[in-house]
Design a protein with these regions (language model features):
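Structural signature of outer-membrane beta-barrel channels/translocons
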Residues: 70-72, 112-116, 153-157, 164, ...
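Gram-negative outer-membrane beta-barrel proteins
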Residues: 86-92, 119, 128-134, 171-176, ...
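Flexible, surface-exposed loop regions and adjacent strand-edge segments
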Residues: 95-99, 138-141, 181-185, 222-225, ...
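Outer-membrane beta-barrel "beta-signal"
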Residues: 380, 457-473
């Protein structure tokens, strides 16, 4: 514990110094430019009367390092982003004394060239991890310098027909099933073709893709037997004061292990819908349900999942919101009956969906959340959340946010009770280009984790600085 605190403090101190240096540099450039402005001539003897309505103050120009696009031709735009995050872990694997603290550094550079009805974008990325002594250090912690995105846009994003071809991010809805996972140091992209159709009543996205694998020492690649395709629609004309988003996703993967131990191909379809909207009494809701059917070799796949959330906006200072939420994902009742009932969460942005600690994913799960958030200072939201977890099936595993099995009791657990978690996090933009965020999570183990693991409680603080350069924000 003492070592993790020391390392966490050192890396945190480095991140804070780095952020303050960026802020100081931006202010210095701005101050220098103000000093270089010519001194206005003395006022004339006859003064012009002030206008009846005061003119709006002039817009403050961005700092010098963020003005690259002002000197670029109008058809070319660039943007850079540097992100530094310090993470700490106490009792990794729910084991006493397995403490760690490490830093995650990521740099991205993007350039977009635009013609009349076509545009091309390339994004380069380099992501590194330092001082990590427990667990893996490869992807998603490390992604050596490579092309992260490279795509062409045909048409305009606001036109009725729009296509994007190439390596790209794909995200739908709350990203519970398909997302870019940008919390991870490497993030996620697909080699894909995506076409968007827009009409007044609805929008439909159709895509065919393959997830990009981060490969150490060589260029990142897709393929390897992975196929992912589907359609996602959205309409605000069906439900009063609401939106419905039906979807269908098809996934194929090779070299997957069936219940009898043989290696075969996975092939399944996920159909579902998301509903979001407003209710009376300052309430809003968010509902999503999905059904999976398919095969993995000799196994039949029958799984489903659901998400139900209601939120109240409370009148008064600090703009408080109260949130209640329930999540369910089916688990496997019998690991030897050739029927797979564990829900596959596909390719989500899973961070903080089921707890800030990311020890729980949308598989074999019952999850309750109660939380509230306030904004006591302008542009500084603070959120507090309580989570409670149970397994859906005792003979199945507890799965992490990544989708990987985290803990299991062979033969079945004595209890489905996983544990409880409390979270707090906040963020604040120091400038339009510099954002500071931090949080802390603590997971109290229940009877299942005490049986399946050493059973010690788990905690994880983080501090993160994000700085945008070249572009305004």
């Amino acid at each position: 514990m003492r070592r993790s605190v020391i390392v966490f403090w050192r890396t945190l101190r480095s991140s804070i110094v780095c952020g303050l240096a960026m802020l100081a540099a931006s202010d210095a450039f701005a101050a220098q430019e103000q000093q270089q402005q010519p001194t206005p001539p003395p006022s004339a003897a006859v003064q012009t009367p002030p206008p009846l309505t005061p003119a709006a103050p002039p817009r403050k120009p961005p700092p010098f390092p963020n003005r690259a696009n002002e000197i670029m031709p109008s058809w070319l735009r660039v943007r850079g982003e540097f992100r530094e995050r310090v993470e700490g872990v106490d009792n990794a694997g729910f084991t006493a004394g397995r403490d760690d603290a490490y830093y995650l550094s990521r740099v991205r550079f993007s350039a977009t060239a635009t013609a009349k009805n076509i545009a091309g974008t390339i994004q380069l990325q380099d992501a590194r991890v330092g001082d990590k002594s427990i667990g893996p250090t490869a992807s998603p912690f490390t992604a050596s310098f490579d092309v992260r995105q490279a795509y062409a846009d045909l048409g305009h994003a606001t036109s009725r027909l729009f296509a994007r071809l190439g390596r790209q991010e794909i995200a739908f809805g709350d990203q519970r099933l398909v997302g870019h996972a940008n919390w991870l140091n490497s993030g996620r992209t697909f080699d894909a073709a995506r076409v968007t159709f827009k009409t007044k009543p609805a929008q439909v996205d159709v895509f065919a893709a393959s997830v990009v694998r981060i490969l150490p020492g060589e260029f990142d690649k897709s393929g390897n037997g992975n196929r992912f395709a589907g359609a996602y629609a959205s309409s605000g004309r069906v439900i009063p004061q609401g939106t419905i988003e039906p979807y269908v996703f098809w996934k194929r993967d090779i070299n997957q292990r069936a219940e009898n131990g043989i290696v075969d191909s996975l092939d399944h379809v996920t159909t579902g819908a998301r509903l979001v909207g407003k209710l009376p009494a300052r309430l809003d809701y968010n509902i999503e349900m999905a059904l999976q059917r398919g095969t993995l070799g000799p196994d039949e796949i029958r799984a489903w999942a659901g998400h139900w959330q209601i939120r109240e906006t409370v009148a008064g200072a600090w703009t408080p919101h109260l949130t209640g939420e329930y999540n369910l994902a089916s688990g496997d009742k019998n690991p030897a009956d050739n029927v797979r009932q564990t829900f596959d969460q596909l390719y989500p942005t899973a961070h903080d969906k089921y707890g800030l600690a990311d020890q729980v994913g949308w598989r074999n799960l019952h999850h309750l959340r109660a939380g509230f958030d306030v904004t006591p200072i302008k542009a500084t939201p603070i959120s507090f959340n309580y989570h409670s977890y149970w397994l859906a099936e005792r003979r199945d595993a507890l799965y992490a946010a990544s989708g990987a099995a985290l803990a299991r009791v062979p033969g079945g657990a004595a209890s489905r009770r996983v544990g409880q978690e409390i979270d707090i996090q906040a963020s604040r933009p120091l400038t339009p280009q510099l954002i500071l965020a931090g949080g802390y999570s603590h997971l109290f183990t229940g009877p299942f984790l005490e049986q399946a693991t050493p059973g010690k409680s788990y905690s994880g603080p983080f501090v993160m600085v994000t700085y945008v350069f070249l572009a305004e924000k």
